[in-house]
A protein has these predicted regions:
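Amphipathic alpha-helical segments used for helix-helix packing
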Residues: 103-126, 174-181
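Hydrophobic/aromatic-rich alpha-helical bundle segments in the mid-to-C-terminal region
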Residues: 147-199
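Short helix-capping/turn signature of helix-turn-helix
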Residues: 31, 54, 116-122, 132-133
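Amphipathic alpha-helical packing segments from all-alpha helical-bundle domains
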Residues: 90, 101, 110, 123-151, ...
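Hydrophobic alpha-helical connector segments
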Residues: 63, 77-109, 155-165, 191
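Helix-turn-helix
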Residues: 17, 21, 25-59, 63-64
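Alpha-helical DNA-contacting segments of helix-turn-helix folds
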Residues: 62-68, 72-76
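N-terminal intrinsically disordered/low-complexity leader segments
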Residues: 1-13, 209-210
Length: 210
């Protein structure tokens, strides 16, 4: 936001309408194909509304991405809290199922394509967004969980283990979904993949069951 004053309810409602319209357009027609005038036409807003609230089209996109990232974070957190006193395997499985379901939705692939398109942005919108939103990345849920365990190895390596587990769940599948439109996993495939990853993560190759 350009102003330090708290926006009025009317302004906030208008910004939410702009974000909702922009999200729908980005997902259905692609980021590059949509102009601010397209968003204004359907949202009933104005250029000043967008510039005052989001500064630019890129700013608007990353505001939307911020909202989605927070929504996914809270969704995964709530799923893991449902079995707060569960075993390590149960917690990892619950986290894994919620996490992988998100990345096997068309919306996640569409956003992945847009994010890739921002890599060469000279204004570093993507880099700045990543730097400023680390706290909303889902691996933090696992990192905090690992830090609470009695196992000293988990405590010491909590962040590395959390990032590794998320990477094992997501890659290379999400990259292939984004880059070459590889098929998304169905529910059965998601469950099987999570079970496989949890097994290897907890037991290693030698200790894993065939």
């Amino acid at each position: 936001m350009n102003s330090n004053r708290t926006p009025s309810q009317k302004v906030l409602a208008r910004q939410e309408k702009i974000k909702a319209v922009a999200l729908e357009l980005f997902l259905t027609k692609g980021y590059q194909e949509i102009s601010l005038s397209d968003i204004i036409k359907l949202s009933g807003g104005s250029y000043s509304n967008i510039y005052d609230g989001f500064k630019s089209k890129e700013g608007l996109f990353f505001e939307i991405l911020d909202d989605i990232c927070k929504k996914h974070f809270h969704l995964i957190y709530s799923k893991t809290q449902e079995i707060e006193n569960g075993t390590l395997k149960e917690i990892l499985t619950s986290f894994g199922l919620a996490f992988i379901e998100i990345f096997n939705q068309p919306e996640a692939v569409a956003f992945g394509k847009i994010i890739y398109s921002q890599v060469y942005d000279k204004d570093r919108h993507l880099a700045n967004w990543i730097e400023n939103n680390q706290q909303n990345f889902s691996y933090n849920i696992l990192m905090d969980f690992f830090k609470q365990q009695n196992n000293s190895y988990m405590k010491k390596n909590a962040e590395k283990l959390a990032v590794l587990f998320c990477t094992m769940l997501k890659e290379p599948y999400h990259h292939l979904n984004v880059l070459i439109n590889a098929p998304l996993k169905n529910k059965k495939e998601q469950k099987e993949h999570v079970e496989f990853v949890v097994n290897v993560f907890l037991n290693g190759i030698n200790g894993s069951k065939a």
